[in-house]
Amino acid sequence: MRIRGVKPFASAVGLLLGLLYAVDAAKVNKHKPWIETTYHGIVTENDDKVLLDPPLIALDKDAPLRYAGEICGFRIHGQNVPFEAVVLDKSTGEGVIRAKDKLDCELQKEHTFTIQAYDCGEGPDGGNMKKSHKATVHIQVNDVNEYSPVFKEKSYKATVIEGKKYDSIMKVEAVDADCSFQFSQICSYEIVTPDVPFTIDKDGNIKNTEKLNYGKERMYKLTVTAYDCGKNRASEDVLVKINIKPTCKPSWQGFNKRIEYEPGTGSLALFPSMHLETCEEPITSIQASIMLETNHIGKGCDRDTYSEKSLHKLCGASSGTVELLPAPSNSANWTVGLPTDNGHDSDQVFEFNGTQAIKVPEGVVSTTLKEPFTISVWMRHGPGGREKETILCNSDKTEMNRHHYSLYVHNCRLVLLLRQEPTESESYKPAEFHWKLDQVCDKEWHHYVLNIEFPAVTLFVDGGTFEPFLVTEDYPLHTSKIETQLTIGACWQGGSARMTQFFRGNLAGLMIRSGKLENKKVIDCLYTCKEGLDVQLPEEVASAVKVEFNPNQSSLSLEGDDIESFEKVMQHISYLNSRQFPTPGIRHLRVSTTVKCFNEETCISVPDSEGYVMVLQPEEPKISLSGIDHFARGAAEFESVEGVTLFPELRIVSTITREVEVEAEAETEAEGEDDPTVQETVVSEEIMHNLDTCEVTVVGEDLNGDHESLEVDLAQIQQRALEMSSSNVGMVITGVNTMANYEQVLHLIRYRNWHTEALFDRKFKLVCSELNGRYISNEFKVEVNVIHTANPMDHANNAMVQPQFISQVQHASVDLSGHNLVNTHQASVVPSAATIVIVVCVSFLVFMIILGVFRIRAAHQRTMRDQENGKENEMDWDDSALTITVNPMETYEDQHSSEEEGDEEEEESEDGEEEDDITSAESDSSEDEAGEQEDQQGSSRQQQLEWDDSTLTY
């Protein structure tokens, strides 16, 4: 018998039991695993096993339940941790930490990270897994002695003096790359070479075991090795060279005999590593003098090599200075015959050998000098004979031999003769001033300046003043109308018409300035060298050493009692050349030293040290002149007051070319590594410097002053402190100034010609230079052509012609420059007499063709009008009185059209096909003129002459 309701009851009971079982199961994994809070481990590099303290064991209170009480794994936290944790036994929770890859102690000695244990959850799927807290793990990597010692240097050198035993000659040092203290330390060094008188300690100090003998051995070569504390020997032994010097000799050490100076680099230290070897002798004081010998450079040293007149201006001298020994030029040619000693790197000087003399032209210096006045000159003169040697002399030109004023040398004395002009009083007055000077006969260059303000005369020699030791008196000169002659290098004897008292030596920069004395500042500036010695005293030794210079800084003297401070000052002595383009060559250098000791008997003697400064050749600037070199202008422009500008777009550019080293990285195809190589590249660099002369010269016939000239605005010249001189061969602009200022002045030079009938072209040449001709530009040649315009044949008839029927001859190129000139060499048009004749003939021929065509066209129009019976005519022409006059010399509108039409006209002349060449350009030109006329009349419709030449016969 089945009981109803049992089945539903059983289901309810089963559901209840399932819920109870689920709740029970949810409480199975109740606890988290547990591990220690900190672990310390050790691992040896190149091994993966880590020894942990304490061991890695995770515990779970849910044990021994399966899953919930088991440890399934460990998880490591941290970035780039080179370790992993592995479970060895799930039930016991035992695990290990091991390295993923081989470790390197040299890269990292210690590693720190965190670790966490997790159980297996409540079943195989790991559900409801629990994690322990995070524990910190510190692992130290133990070193392996895998590296050998390596010496810091590839080789070692030392120098010792014979006969001495040293505590330490030198020290060698090796390093080991191992990371541990034990294996990275060098425990010992060893000299491998047998039977040598040297030993080495554990710190690498080498010393000699006996006194060394220079005669026995001048150099020892030792092989040294090293051992680390793990007994590893150095991978490579090192070579040690010990030089033996003879017994100590006091001298300056670290002195380079050759010192190269590159222009433009400022000051150069001469003795940067210099020190005094005293051989351990106690020194109480020391003195030294440093001499820079520059007497062979220029006039005693390196100075700017501009003309003496330019140098006076640069030094601030006022105007009125006259240069009596200028460089030969078109405007100053009286020095042409004199031998010169100029290499363009230095000043231009004139040589007098006792047979040459020159006469200064009249007008260069006034006959009677206004007082006060100044005479200045550079002179080099050796011991002479008993004869007087005249530098400058102003004497009677004819009849008599009176010397009005004279500067001469006699028995190593410099003498100024100054005779007074006739006066009412006949009393004695000072006439001769004598100076006895060593400089007059020492064969060296010296600068002499005489400031004369009668009766006082002041002499400056190399910037220093000298008083005359003797002054003699004489009567004033007698009244005479005889003219005087100014000579240089001898004195003119007017009575016998010959030269006498010839000079033997060298002169340069002979100047006279009347009306004003030269001030001391200008004199010092003229004499000051652009090169010399310099010293920047360190503050700590400035008071310990006394330093003195001579006036031109070619020598200095030092004095002190502390050797260390003295050496520091010596190391700061430098050579300086402030010129942009210095004179290259050798400057000898000498250091002379004296010392004082406590014991004078055994005091040392320091020999002189000698060397030289080699001033290298400066990069030579290339001065380039460029611009429009060919153009044409109408004759009217040449005849106008303004004239024609010769250099409207002139550009002056200076460049230097130098070699520079460039590092280039080239990848090797085989290894793919960078292979840096050094390449030399030539680069051109624009620089700025001054110019001192620009000369415009006529190419061809000289200028005819009756009808042509070169002109420039003198106010603009003076505003830029320049000077201009002109002659029939051209124009010279002088003065030290910037390239930009010279450019502006050259833009203003104009050529005028007020009789151009027979002139068709003129050619000019421009050359600029720097440093008195040391650097010269290219020759910039300019050709200007004259465009002649023919006179109209009949102005009245020409005015009557309608513009539609005037065939325009397009404008010949008036200006082949600027925008119209594409290439001044390839596309220039040069009108000439032959060209003008051709244009006239062709224009007349074209005119006849147009006239013939016009008449044929008119006849054809009348025929058509008769056939159309009353039709309104387009045009009605009455040519019975028609006269057309065309100016055959009408200029072309542009150069391009001129060239095209010129080619067409040549083809017409050659082929005889003139009738077929009525071009559309000519028709267009007629139409354009017609349109202009109608615009002026206010017409809204443009009338054009349309030709139908389909029925024309020729």
UniProtKB/Swiss-Prot annotation:
GO CC terms: axon; cell surface; endoplasmic reticulum membrane; Golgi membrane; postsynaptic membrane
Keywords: Calcium, Cell adhesion, Cell membrane, Cell projection, Endoplasmic reticulum, Glycoprotein, Golgi apparatus, Membrane, Postsynaptic cell membrane, Repeat, Signal, Synapse, Transmembrane, Transmembrane helix
Endoplasmic reticulum is among the record's keywords: yes
Major subcellular site: membrane
Biological process according to GO: axon arborization; axonal transport; endocytic recycling; establishment or maintenance of microtubule cytoskeleton polarity; homophilic cell adhesion via plasma membrane adhesion molecules; positive regulation of synapse assembly; positive regulation of synaptic transmission; regulation of collateral sprouting
Family matches, as CDD domains: Cadherin_repeat
Alphabetized Gene3D superfamilies for the sequence: 2.60.120.200, Cadherins
Signal peptide span: 1-25
Membrane topology, record value: Single-pass type I membrane protein
Keyword Cell membrane on entry: yes
Compartments where located: Postsynaptic cell membrane; Endoplasmic reticulum membrane; Golgi apparatus membrane; Cell projection, Neuron projection
Domain Cadherin: 35-151, 152-252
Ranges for region Disordered: 891-954
Cytoplasmic side: 855-954
Sites where a glycan is attached: N333, N353, N552
Residues exposed to the Extracellular side: 26-833
Source organism, top-level taxon: Eukaryota
InterPro entries documented for this protein: Cadherin-like_dom, Cadherin-like_sf, CLSTN_C, ConA-like_dom_sf
GO molecular function: calcium ion binding
Protein task: Postsynaptic adhesion molecule involved in vesicle trafficking; required for branching of peripheral but not central axons of sensory neurons. Promotes synapse development by acting as a cell adhesion molecule at the postsynaptic membrane, which associates with presynaptic neurexins.
Alphabetical list of PANTHER family matching this protein: CALSYNTENIN, CALSYNTENIN-1
Summary of subunit composition and partner proteins: Homooligomer and heterooligomer; mediates both homophilic and heterophilc interactions with clstn2 and clstn3 paralogs via cadherin domains.
The protein's name in its UniProt record: Calsyntenin-1
Native source species: Danio rerio (Zebrafish)
